[in-house]
């Protein structure tokens, strides 16, 4: 049973859109999952991952008001969609002949776009040995240390480009290995479709990967840890 649950979770994780780039010990992009991660506004003051950035101007304050309303509407739409799915499931379990309809992606509630004052550049954190960089500022622990100079900013941008290529390669490798191990999407769909298409067979094709695997780039030397 535990294996089945693990397999289903793996399938969901691989199918879900990525909202974070994550490499342990190097880059972590917080996605605003509770607490103080991501962008937080209180008293018209903007924080990113717990660090104070600045006060919102009047235009941004109005943008925040509009965003709050959009979030409330989105939550209500999600709640209604879940209620309809639950009622449909209950009817089918009660023996009523009701065709299962998979909602189209365009019919699903859409999360509102983040305000313009909360960007990926604001919430991206680069973790190096001894320090962390966010918003082109160096922190030691939670203490602000200094600003990056222009050369260091450019160096960080180049590092992020190379690191992104490396991460995408690694993720494709993992997806290919999981697909080969569990038989691809058909393995997971069998749990939810009850194996309705009996006798059918498919071949999982591994994604095409570069012949030469990219190397993980060395991190910039913005701080020195004393061992």
UniProtKB/Swiss-Prot annotation:
InterPro entries in the record: Pepsin-I3, Pepsin-I3_sf, Protease_Inhibitor_I33
Region (Disordered): 88-116
Signal peptide: 1-15
Organism annotation: Ostertagia ostertagi (Brown stomach worm)
Coiled-coil region(s): none
Biased composition (Basic and acidic residues): 88-109
Protein name: Aspartyl protease inhibitor
Assigned protein family: Belongs to the protease inhibitor I33 family.
Gene expressing this chain: API
Keywords noted in UniProt: Aspartic protease inhibitor, Disulfide bond, Protease inhibitor, Secreted, Signal
Annotated compartments: Secreted
UniProt main location, coarse: secreted
Covalent S-S links between cysteines: 131-223
Recorded GO CC terms: extracellular region
Keyword Lipid biosynthesis: no
Example of a GO MF term: aspartic-type endopeptidase inhibitor activity
Role according to the record: Aspartyl protease inhibitor.
């Amino acid at each position: 049973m535990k294996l089945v649950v693990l397999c289903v979770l793996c399938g969901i994780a691989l199918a879900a859109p990525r909202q974070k780039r994550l490499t342990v010990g190097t880059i972590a992009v917080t996605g605003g999952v509770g607490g103080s991660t991501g962008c937080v506004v209180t008293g018209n003051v903007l924080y990113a991952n717990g660090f104070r950035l600045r006060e919102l101007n009047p235009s941004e304050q109005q943008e925040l008001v509009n965003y709050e309303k959009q979030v409330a509407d989105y939550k209500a739409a999600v709640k209604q969609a879940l209620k309809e799915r639950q009622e449909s499931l209950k009817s089918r379990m009660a023996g009523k002949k009701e065709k299962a309809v998979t909602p189209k992606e365009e019919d699903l509630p859409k999360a509102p776009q983040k305000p313009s004052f909360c960007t990926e550049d604001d919430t991206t954190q680069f973790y190096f040995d001894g320090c962390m960089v966010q918003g082109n500022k160096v922190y030691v622990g939670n203490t602000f240390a200094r600003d990056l100079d222009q050369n260091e900013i450019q160096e960080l941008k180049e590092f992020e480009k190379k690191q992104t290529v490396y991460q995408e390669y690694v993720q494709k490798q993992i997806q290919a290995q999981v697909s080969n191990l569990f038989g691809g999407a058909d393995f997971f769909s069998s749990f939810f479709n009850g194996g309705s298409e009996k006798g059918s067979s498919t071949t999982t094709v591994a994604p095409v990967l570069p012949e030469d695997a990219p190397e993980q780039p060395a991190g910039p030397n913005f701080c020195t840890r004393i061992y």
